[in-house]
Swiss-Prot record:
GO molecular function, one term: ribonuclease P activity
Domain of life of the organism encoding this protein: Archaea
Catalytic activity annotation: Endonucleolytic cleavage of RNA, removing 5'-extranucleotides from tRNA precursor
A single Gene Ontology CC term: cytoplasm
Name of the protein: Ribonuclease P protein component 3
Length: 199
């Protein structure tokens, strides 16, 4: 399983993840974060993405709805104020855009706001399961103190009903799409020819 981080740590301890994807606003990681306040701003910023990298979007509900319809967008990133409606999640399933479910937003909030986030997470997972929406579970850590082990992340989301094997599959597929030269699409890969046994 891969973890998607929002910072570039100096020393990264072994937390049980296969590898890490660094989603940064400055394009020096494996992924690019685009923050937009309107669909028009999103389209303008997407045109500016030249590099081949995983593209994640952070924005209000209208921006997220627009993002799932854009071919260049790979994942809708999670944050405290993200709200995804039923139609956006259904569109994400049709357009193969992953939805990130992150642990760090629960660490940064408390009280009623945290309880509201728990309820929203439960509802999102119900719709994700209903429409088989691609999703990933991550820490989305913005600093060293928000890092958690793979087991902690998986156990947390499993408690709310997330299908962890599917989350692993979607994360692996997303990473392979950009960083595995033998990957074409699900079920199609370039195989290496072996000289032994060929007549």
């Amino acid at each position: 399983m891969y973890d998607f981080l929002r910072f570039f740590p100096e020393n990264l301890p072994d937390l049980g993840f296969k590898s890490y994807v660094f989603m940064l606003e400055k394009p020096k990681g494996c992924g690019i974060v685009i923050r937009a306040n309107s669909p028009e701003e999103l389209r303008k910023k997407l045109r500016g993405v030249k590099r081949r990298a995983i593209v994640g979007i952070i924005g209000k509900e209208a921006v997220c709805r627009e993002a799932v319809m854009r071919r260049r967008v790979d994942v809708i990133l999670d944050w405290e104020d993200r709200e995804l409606d039923y139609a956006t999640l259904k569109l994400a399933a049709e357009k193969d855009v992953a939805i990130e479910l992150s642990l760090s937003k629960f660490l940064r909030t408390e009280g009623y706001k945290r309880m509201h986030l728990f309820e929203r997470l439960r509802q999102e997972i119900m719709v994700i399961r209903k429409f088989d929406v691609p999703f990933i579970v991550t820490t989305a850590a913005e600093n060293q103190y928000e890092l958690r082990t793979r087991k902690q992340v998986e156990t947390f989301f499993k408690f709310f009903g997330a299908e962890i094997p599917k989350a692993r599959l979607y994360a692996q597929r997303l990473v392979r799409r950009y960083f595995d030269e033998n990957y074409i699409m699900d079920g199609f890969e370039v195989e290496q020819l072996s000289n032994s046994g060929v007549v």
